[in-house]
Amino acid sequence: MKLALQIYTLRQYLGADDIRETLRKTKEMGYEGVEWPGLMGYSPAGLAKITRDAGLEMFSVHINMDDVIACDTDVMDGLAAEGVKWLPIGWLPDVRLAGGELFEETCGLIRKYSAEAAERGLLVLYHNHDFDLAPCGDATRLDALYAALPGDVLGAEPDTCWLYSGGVDPVEYLGKYADRAPVIHLKDCVKEGGRKGYKPVGSGVLDWDGILPACEKAEWVCVEQDDPSDGLDAFRCAAKSAAFLKEKLGK
């Protein structure tokens, strides 16, 4: 299991003048790879070079439904050539989730995109949010999505904070979908007065002694903190998460 940072965590420091130094600092914290929230205006080769130059692996790049609809096989070819393995869909709007009027259409579009991706050795994943855990029949909308699309068409990228704030047990859900989750987002949080607050991993309310063993089948665990907290900037939050996880994982 390798340790990565979803670089969205440091999104304020990814401008052309900052990106290389940001990646250098990410490597210095002890991260082995980064997951990109998109191509950031670069070509696949250009983004991969910047990542590799910092000593980091580029293993996963997020996509959205516009990308799925466009189904650009040239981009897929470029990503596959650079060693990317996974293309997580970052989120789906309500109308495209189970129970929404475009759910069946969405499943068809994902099947088409996934088939092209699979020909290139890429697997499409789905990154959940709390709204994906809304009830749908006897299960949740996330369950319904995974029931509609098998794991070789749509894998999982579970997010621990969103599972928790969505009202399910992260440990239980990680176990439930362990066989289709090669990448897992590790995110900590608190709930104060019904409001969610992000925290460095190990600083919130999540049960890491239960969560980390439940991640053992994953190839990558990926820290993400949407906004900094505790009076720390985003770099210090990411470093604090890395230090906690390196100790827990024996890295």
Language model features with spans:
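Short acidic, glycine/proline-enriched helix-loop-strand junctions
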Residues: S43-H62, L122
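Active-site acidic/histidine proton-transfer and metal-coordination neighborhood
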Residues: R24, G33, E57, M65-A156, ...
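Active-site beta-loop-alpha junctions enriched in small/polar residues
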Residues: Q6-L10, P37-L39, H62-D66, L92-D94, ...
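Short, well-ordered alpha-helical microsegments
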Residues: S43-A45, D72, L142, W208-D209
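Active-site-adjacent beta->alpha loops and helix N-cap segments on the catalytic face
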Residues: M40-I50, R96-A98, L102-F103
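Histidine-acidic metal/acid-base catalytic patches
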Residues: M1-M29, R52, G78-G83, C136-G155, ...
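Generic beta-strand hydrophobic packing signal
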Residues: V34, F59-V61, I184, V221
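Domain-start "cap" segments at the beginnings of catalytic or binding domains
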Residues: E35-M40, P44, T51, D66, ...
